[in-house]
Amino acid sequence: MIKNCIRLTVSAILSALISACATSPEQSLYDEIGGHKTLNTIYGVAITRIYTDPVIGHYFKGVPKKHLRDQLVLQTCELIGGPCEYDGKSMVESHKDLNIKEREFYILVEYVQGAMRDVGLTYQQENRILKKLAPIKYETVYL
């Protein structure tokens, strides 16, 4: 009886140790921020501001807001670990011949950042998203 009790105790301890060592899959940034709904809100807010901006608004004339929002959501979703697959034009193709200046690019970034704050993202989440989006600058500025 004592042997069985010892075996059960050892077995329980080993089971607990093995369970503690098992790693659960890390939550994606996409899921952490609230997924598609949050991205849709962020870009909806940012686009409203961008389209009326006196410096960069002219770049978006003729581009339907919903189309732009959908493309930005898809692209960001894919970059931050969501289930989406961006299938739009390449950034180089979409921005060629626009002569976007670095200053203009950062105006857009500020609107997106502001929208992230407005929906309640933490600075850490905001910075992690911006880090994923940062390479886009080199595909859009001065092309």
Language model regions located:
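C-terminal motif of bacterial Sec signal peptides marking the signal peptidase cleavage site
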Residues: L17-A20
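Globin-like tetrapyrrole-binding proteins
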Residues: A22-L143
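Bacterial N-terminal signal peptides that target proteins for export
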Residues: M1-V10
